Swiss-Prot record:
Name of the featured protein: Bidirectional sugar transporter SWEET4
Chain segments carrying region Disordered: 220-251
Compositionally biased region (Polar residues): 231-245
Pfam families on file: MtN3_slv
Entry keyword annotation includes Membrane: yes
Organism placement in taxonomy: Eukaryota, Viridiplantae, Streptophyta, Embryophyta, Tracheophyta
């Protein structure tokens, strides 16, 4: 049991490192936005989605939902703060119409999390019931966000080019999924297994596509659209790592 606990902790630590990398990977995108003083065609969608997921996991880690989950709050709180900084930069350099859209989405997300929190605390009265209820929402959103890379993978196949699918994030996607799947199997956890199983499959498919189309990719410089697509893929990758972390401290 001690060895299993150590193995789970090691897997969790590795997952945390990868998750932090994924949280920070959009930085080049926002450096570009800051230098140009405008958002151009970049979209706030992936960052808004990550804010919602992080907020749900922070709530999941609270003592009244899942006791002894301080690290859940820490890692997802960190991710939430990072994403809010990204959105603040995006908001500052956006035209008025896009500022309104971002603001309305953030308000909507706050209302949604508030409704989930209220229902959790009023309708469920045990930690197991509450953690299961909130965990289901977290897994649903993680699963939905794995749909995002499908458009990028489709573009890779159509263009026979991997310029829109950076190898580093594809590899991080795969490793992140594998680490948390291993963690989930050491002491079976369905929530972790579902989300990160999807992450493993998604990462594996991306790596296979990369191997197939790397040689047919034009050897030109990456453009800004690469960074935008990179951040879209990145948004859901960091989430599956966080879902695994949420279970590690509660074991």
């Amino acid at each position: 049991m001690v060895n299993a606990t150590v193995a789970r902790n090691i897997a969790g630590i590795c997952g945390n490192v990868i998750s932090l990398f994924l949280f920070l990977s959009p930085i080049p995108t926002f450096i570009t936005i800051y230098k140009k003083k405008k958002v151009e065609e970049y979209k706030a969608d992936p960052y808004l989605a990550t804010v919602l997921n992080c907020a749900l996991w922070v709530f999941y880690g609270l003592p009244m939902v899942q006791p002894d989950s301080l690290l859940v709050i820490t890692i997802n709180g960190t991710g939430l703060a990072i994403e809010l900084v990204y959105l603040a930069i995006f908001f500052f350099f956006s035209p008025t119409s896009r500022k309104v859209k971002v603001g309305l989405w953030l308000i909507g997300e706050m209302v949604f999390v508030g409704i989930v929190a209220t229902c959790t605390l009023l309708l469920f009265h045990t930690h197991n019931q509450r953690s299961s209820f909130v965990g289901i929402f977290c897994v649903i959103f993680v699963s939905l966000m794995y749909i995002a890379p499908l458009t990028i993978m489709s573009k890779v196949i159509k263009t026979k080019s991997v310029k829109y699918m950076p190898f580093s994030l594809s590899l991080a996607n795969f490793l992140n999924g594998v680490v948390w799947v291993i963690y989930a199997l050491i002491k079976f956890d369905l929530f972790i297994l579902i989300g990160n199983g999807l992450g493993t499959v998604s990462g594996a498919v991306q790596l296979i596509l990369y191997a197939c189309y790397y040689k047919t990719t034009p050897k030109d410089d990456e453009d800004e659209e690469d960074e935008e697509n990179l951040s879209k893929v990145n948004s859901q990758l960091q989430l599956s790592g966080n879902s695994g972390q949420a279970k590690r401290v509660s074991a």
